[in-house]
């Protein structure tokens, strides 16, 4: 199983107070591209999605701020407020695989995380920002793979799966 994660940062030009930006960026950048790639690889190996006949996947991870995610949330979900994570799946998982899926990686979609909101939530939960970012990434990943939480029971199932995924990775190593 192979997963390629394309990571983008969109924080540097924003109107976040400079002291907050400096601290948040320092913490967020503790998770290197190699670490993100390793985490997603572990998560995929655990989840064993069977979408791609060649077991090769791609996804994008955008780490941004509240203003950018609020714009996306307003545009696509008609909720004009920031949120912690959005996931935009490329696939309709009810579709039949095409011949192209036998030749190329399956593009799952995009996960967008507000580092600004993640930092606030990490502080409220009293854990490091990298742990919160990993938690939100697992939530977005599960959405890309077809998970949803329309009921309290489904939300609990999803949260339990997120905890399993977090336990597979050494999140604390990213904070040292």
From Swiss-Prot:
Keyword vocabulary terms for this entry: Cytoplasm, Endonuclease, Hydrolase, Metal-binding, Nuclease, Ribosome biogenesis, rRNA processing, Zinc
Enzyme Commission (EC) number: 3.1.-.-
Main localization category: cytoplasm
Residues binding Zn(2+): 139, 143, 149
One cellular component (GO) term of this entry: cytoplasm
UniProt remark on cofactor binding: Binds 1 zinc ion.
Signal peptide span: none
Cofactor list: Zn(2+)
InterPro entries found in the cross-reference section: MetalPrtase_cat_dom_sf_prd, YbeY, YbeY_CS
Biological processes per GO annotation: rRNA processing
Pfam families: YbeY (PF02130)
Cellular localization per UniProt: Cytoplasm
EC category: hydrolase
UniProt-recorded Gene Ontology molecular function terms: metalloendopeptidase activity; RNA endonuclease activity; zinc ion binding
Keyword Cytoplasm: yes
HAMAP family reported for this sequence: Endoribonucl_YbeY (MF_00009)
Family, as annotated: Belongs to the endoribonuclease YbeY family.
Described purpose of this protein according to its UniProt entry: Single strand-specific metallo-endoribonuclease involved in late-stage 70S ribosome quality control and in maturation of the 3' terminus of the 16S rRNA.
Full protein name: Endoribonuclease YbeY
Gene: ybeY
């Amino acid at each position: 199983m192979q997963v390629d994660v394309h990571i983008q940062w969109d924080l540097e030009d924003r109107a976040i107070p400079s002291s907050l930006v400096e601290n948040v960026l320092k913490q967020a950048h503790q998770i290197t591209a190699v670490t993100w790639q390793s985490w997603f690889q572990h998560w995929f190996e655990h989840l064993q999605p069977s979408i791609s006949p060649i077991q090769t996947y791609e996804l994008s991870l955008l780490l941004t701020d509240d203003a950018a995610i609020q714009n996306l949330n307003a545009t696509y979900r008609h909720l004009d407020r920031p949120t912690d994570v959005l996931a935009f799946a490329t696939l309709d998982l009810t579709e039949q695989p095409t011949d192209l899926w036998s030749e190329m990686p399956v593009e799952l979609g995009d996960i967008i995380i507000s580092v600004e909101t993640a930092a606030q939530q990490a502080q409220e939960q009293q854990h490091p920002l990298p742990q919160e970012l990993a938690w939100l990434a697992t939530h977005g990943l599960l959405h890309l793979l077809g998970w949803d939480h329309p009921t309290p029971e489904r939300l609990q199932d999803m949260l339990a799966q997120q905890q399993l995924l977090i336990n597979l990775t050494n999140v604390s190593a990213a904070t040292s």
